[in-house]
Structures are given as C-alpha cells and as structure tokens.
C-alpha cells in the first residue's frame, strides 16, 4: 500500500488514512484495469463470489461453510444480470472465463454488498469494444440502482463527460480542472481539451 504525503482520506465522515487494508476493503469496492487481477483463477465462480460476500459481511476470518443455499441462490441471481450464462457455470474455475467475463464478475463481486465507494481504474480499457460497452452499461446500471458513490479513472474524454456528474482532470499528480453542474452539461470534448490547455499551459491530444 502507498501512503499519502499529506492530508487525510475521509470516507463518510471516517478517517481511513492509515486504516488496515482488510478493514477498509469491507466498505470500498474496486476494479483494476487488468481483468485478471480481480478474481482467483483456480477457484470456482461460486467460491470467488463467496469470498467477496464473506469479506464484506463478516468481521472475523470467513469460512466457506458460512455460505448457505440462500446465499448461493443470491449468487445465481446476481450472475444472471450479466446475461453471459455464468449462473449455470458456478462450479467452473474462473480461469476458464474470458477477460470480459472475469471483469464483469469482478464488478459483481465488488458491489455484491453495496460499498460506500466504488473505485474504477480504467476497468474497460483492456476489453474489446463490445465487451467494454456491456461492462460499462452494467456498471452504470448498478451504480444508479444502488446509488453508489463512484470514482472512475479514464483516458476516454467522451466517458469523462458522459458518465457521472463531475469531471476532474489531473496533470502531473495535480487536479487542474474540476467541472460539474450546468457548465459540465454543455461541454464537448473540444471544450474539455481547451480548458486543459488553459489550466495546464500545454495541449493534450484526445
């Protein structure tokens, strides 16, 4: 883990700056750019979902014996949302899935128990366009239905303006632009690039 140079990290009124990773993982969901990083390949789909579920629901070491029939039915219900047929493959190792299927599964795992914040680190960048759209649409649906606070990192300017209600632009580790509300609603990619040029003193290609 990396620690901040200065300041505090406060989530829902609680200082989590130096909180242990296994503690804050109960309230923070995250997806990496690499679709292979969010799941355990040698464990089954059901076991991966059980790990995510138990991690968020229990305060002590979790054991698979705590997963009951009702929990497994909930797993199937969540998997059916993907429309990928994974609800009928729960006993298969995750390593047999495609990158897109694994990323979609990771999204379900990260939101199975609603987190206080969901962190998305370019989570569709490594996927083919069709799969990326499917995962992004599912992300939008889950975030909207559960009213989850979400922070998404992207290099896609269209996504930066289309998704969410606030756009931040960074340069060399510093936030140089923060737009929301009516100003953001009327912005185009060209406007965003121009604002970046004004704030950063240099041009950026889209």
Where are these regions (language model features)?
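Helical segment within the ABC ATPase nucleotide-binding domain
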Residues: 133-145
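Helix N-cap at the start of a conserved alpha-helix in ABC-type nucleotide-binding domains
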Residues: 129-131
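H-loop/switch region of ABC-family ATPase nucleotide-binding domains
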Residues: 154-155
């Amino acid at each position: 883990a990396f620690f901040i140079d200065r300041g505090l990290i406060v989530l829902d009124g609680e200082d989590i700056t130096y909180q242990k990773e296994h503690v804050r993982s109960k309230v923070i969901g995250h997806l990496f750019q690499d679709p292979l990083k969010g799941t355990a390949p040698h464990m089954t789909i059901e076991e991966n979902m059980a790990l995510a579920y138990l991690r968020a629901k229990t305060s002590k070491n979790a054991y698979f014996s705590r997963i009951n029939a009702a929990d497994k039915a909930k797993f199937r219900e969540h998997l059916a949302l993907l429309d990928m047929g994974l609800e009928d493959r729960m006993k298969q190792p995750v390593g047999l899935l495609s990158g897109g299927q694994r990323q979609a599964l990771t999204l379900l795992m990260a939101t199975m128990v609603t987190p206080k914040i969901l962190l998305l680190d370019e989570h569709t960048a490594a996927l083919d366009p069709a799969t990326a759209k499917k995962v992004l649409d599912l992300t939008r649906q889950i975030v909207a239905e559960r009213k989850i606070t979400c922070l998404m990192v992207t290099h896609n300017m269209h996504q930066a303006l289309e998704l969410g209600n606030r756009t931040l632009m960074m340069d060399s580790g510093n936030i140089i632009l923060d737009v929301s509300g009516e100003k953001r609603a009327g912005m185009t990619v060209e406007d965003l690039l121009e604002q970046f040029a004004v704030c950063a003193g240099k041009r950026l290609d889209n």
